[in-house]
Amino acid sequence: MIQEWYEVWVDESTKIPYVLFLCPDPSNPGGMLIIDPKENNRIIQKLPDYNTAMLWLTEDEYTRVDGRMEIE
């Protein structure tokens, strides 16, 4: 799966923060994927756009780690 960038989102409500990745969906222009690295990078959500993905993450009390990681 080739990506241009990804964001790191964390749930800090637990003793050890839980991490998810947010990245563009290469099979759906404008779409977003939420990936769980702890589950062997399994895609846990496919969402239609960035705003919907942000709402999904913030509803579950995830916060974005500052910055966006570029992939070369």
What does each model-identified segment do?
Residues 11, 36, 51-54:
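Generic structural signal for short, flexible, solvent-exposed coil/loop and linker residues
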Residues 14-42, 59-63:
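Short aromatic-glycine-(Arg/Gly/Cys) micro-motifs in beta-strand/loop hairpins
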Residues 42-72:
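Mixed-charge, Lys/Arg-enriched low-complexity segments
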Residues 1-14:
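Negatively charged, low-complexity tracts enriched in Asp/Glu with abundant Ser/Thr
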